[in-house]
Swiss-Prot record:
The keyword Nuclease does not apply. SUPFAM superfamilies: EF-G C-terminal domain-like, P-loop containing nucleoside triphosphate hydrolases, Translation proteins. Keywords: Cytoplasm, GTP-binding, Nucleotide-binding, Protein biosynthesis. GTP binds at residues 18-25, 86-90, 140-143. This is Peptide chain release factor 3. Its main location: cytoplasm. InterPro entries: EF-G-like_DII, EFG_III/V, G_TR_CS, P-loop_NTPase, PrfC, RF3_C, RF3_dom_3_sf, RF3_GTP-bd. It comes from the Bacteria. Belongs to the TRAFAC class translation factor GTPase superfamily. Classic translation factor GTPase family. PrfC subfamily. It comes from Dechloromonas aromatica (strain RCB). GO terms for molecular function: GTP binding; GTPase activity; translation release factor activity, codon nonspecific; translation release factor activity, codon specific. Residues 9-275 form the tr-type G domain.
Length: 524
């Protein structure tokens, strides 16, 4: 095996997806703790003290207890190198989550046992399904009274349309929660909330008399449950899992550390190493000798002391070496990357090398955009980083007119990293913001104040939807001349039609048949 093949086989790059409050941030912390990456699992409930969850580092996230940016964390576990991408937990940030899901090879879906499948989970799973992403399921909060496990599996199968293959099975729930049975190891792990790793004892075999000693009549209930589960549920099928058709299911309680290590072991044992990536011209294999990668996220001011911008790049093929010359395909320029970094949320360190599956950060001053491809020279363009038409719009006004330049710079940077979309109508000097959800405006206002020293006022803007305009240049000029207040340039200087309502949108579509009005576009 070549060094490249060896490093590829060791990589596991995955994201955690869930509905808000299903316990995703807690699970992230506990995975890091079991992986030895952090010393204290900084309980989310302790946020009101000074200790905040490792992956929630932005000021607004600390105040509200939600993740609004995607964090990247790398740590070794067993013989593997784990790249864990935490995703925004609030429904307003589905676009950032979508972009993050383009950079992973698998995902862990967290389901709250009390609430079952929720709206955001459905949306995110649909995104995973578009790419056939393999999904492990962690059913969380078994220490609370929730839905029956068999009902939860039925719900996942019927609502999400994915087969479930239980790998562990819970013994009771809430106050009667005693642990889980491992269906493929024939072992029982007993739950103890006081034990450091959540597990009091592990025994082998359903017929072990120690089982009856420890849980009494629940032992016979468990034996009956397992007989039923083995007969009624799907057996684990590696091929079905890797093609996104089946999800292995684990039960646990992340807040009590229980079931987390089994999940982390499954990431190592079941999840795929880096996979081939589609580009416009061809499929790129991870073990190709030449380096390639794409930018799936840009984050400004990760450390306000440094006033920096970091482009998060997923390595797709070959090996990255510090100081190597790479081609920024969009501009055709060759760059030397001497200061690439790896992450543990806000903590960062300079890296000398990176392999397929790894995420590296490239510091820059606004010269790198979302979706850009980097290679050793080939004119590749990786596909699939989307930008969606916003559903909410605001007009940005500034309290202090002397700070208009800071406002323009701040909005341009925040738009380039994907925190919001910025539109400048062809007539006038208005700055219009578009967002998938209204919380994004709060985030933008907070960041403008904290990072750029600008107080902004957002006013309602009369716009129902936006559409990117492609097609005949002459018709585009006619449209722009006639409706200059409604045609705007976005952050990448692409033309956009800002429709006051659907009647106007349908009217211009009829009037300009050689133009296409697109709801989404690829960023690059």
């Amino acid at each position: 095996m070549t060094p490249l093949d060896n490093e590829i086989s060791r990589r596991r790059t995955f994201a955690i997806i869930s509905h808000p409050d299903a316990g995703k941030t807690t699970l992230t912390e506990k995975l890091l703790w079991f992986g030895g990456a952090i010393q204290v699992a900084g309980e989310v409930r302790a946020r009101k003290a000074s200790r905040h969850a490792t992956s929630d580092w932005m000021e607004l996230e600390k105040q509200r207890g939600i993740s609004v940016t995607s964090s990247v964390m790398q740590f070794p576990y067993r013989e593997c190198m784990i790249n864990l991408l935490d995703t925004p937990g609030h429904e307003d940030f589905s676009e950032d989550t979508y972009r993050t899901l383009t950079a992973v090879d698998s995902a862990v879906m967290v389901i709250d046992s009390v609430n079952g499948v929720e709206a955001q989970t459905i949306k995110l799973l649909n995104v995973c399904r578009m790419r056939d992403t393999p999904i492990l399921t962690f059913i969380n909060k078994l220490d609370r009274e929730g839905k029956e496990p068999i009902d939860l599996l039925d719900e996942i199968e019927s609502v999400l349309g994915i087969q479930c293959a239980p790998m562990t099975w819970p013994i009771g729930m809430g106050k009667r929660f005693r642990g889980v049975y491992h269906l493929y190891d024939d072992a029982i792990a007993f739950f103890d909330p006081q034990a450091e790793k959540g597990t009091a004892e592990i025994i082998q075999g359903l017929d072990n008399p120690r089982l009856d000693e420890l849980i009494g009549t629940q032992a016979d209930e468990l034996r009956m449950d397992i007989e039923l589960v083995r007969g009624a549920s799907h057996a684990f099928d590696a091929e079905a899992y890797l093609s996104g058709k089946q999800s292995p299911v684990f039960f646990g309680s992340a807040v009590n550390n229980f079931g987390v290590q089994s999940l982390l072991d499954a990431v190592v044992d079941l999840s795929p190493p880096p996979i081939a990536r589609p580009s416009v011209s061809r499929e790129v294999l991870p073990n190709e000798p030449k380096f390639s990668g794409f930018v799936f996220k840009i984050q400004a001011n990760m450390d306000p002391k440094h006033r920096d911008r970091i482009a998060f790049l997923r390595v797709c093929s070959g090996r990255f070496d510090r100081g190597m010359k790479v081609k920024q395909v969009a501009s055709g320029k060759m760059l030397s990357i001497n200061n690439a970094i790896t992450f543990m949320a806000r903590d960062r360190s300079t890296t000398d090398e990176a392999w397929p599956g790894d995420i590296i950060g490239i510091p820059n001053h606004g010269t790198i955009r979302l979706g850009e491809t980097f290679t050793e020279g080939e004119d590749l363009r990786f596909t699939g980083i989307p930008s969606f038409a916003p559903e909410h719009f605001r007009l940005a006004r500034i309290a202090n007119p002397l700070k208009i330049k800071q406002l323009q710079k701040g909005l341009q940077q925040l738009a380039e990293e994907g925190a919001t979309q910025l539109f400048r109508p062809l007539s006038g000097t208005d700055l219009i913001l578009g967002a998938v959800g209204t919380l994004q405006f709060d985030v933008v206002a907070s960041r403008l104040e904290n990072e750029y020293g600008v107080q902004v006022i957002f006013e309602h803007y009369n716009c129902a939807t936006a559409r990117w305009i492609h097609g005949d240049a002459a018709e585009l000029r006619q449209l722009s001349d006639r409706y200059s207040a409604n045609v705007a340039l976005d952050g990448a200087d692409d033309p956009v039609y800002l429709a006051p309502n659907n009647v106007y949108l349908n009217m211009v579509k009829e009037k300009y048949p050689n133009l296409r009005f697109l709801e989404a576009r690829e960023v690059a």
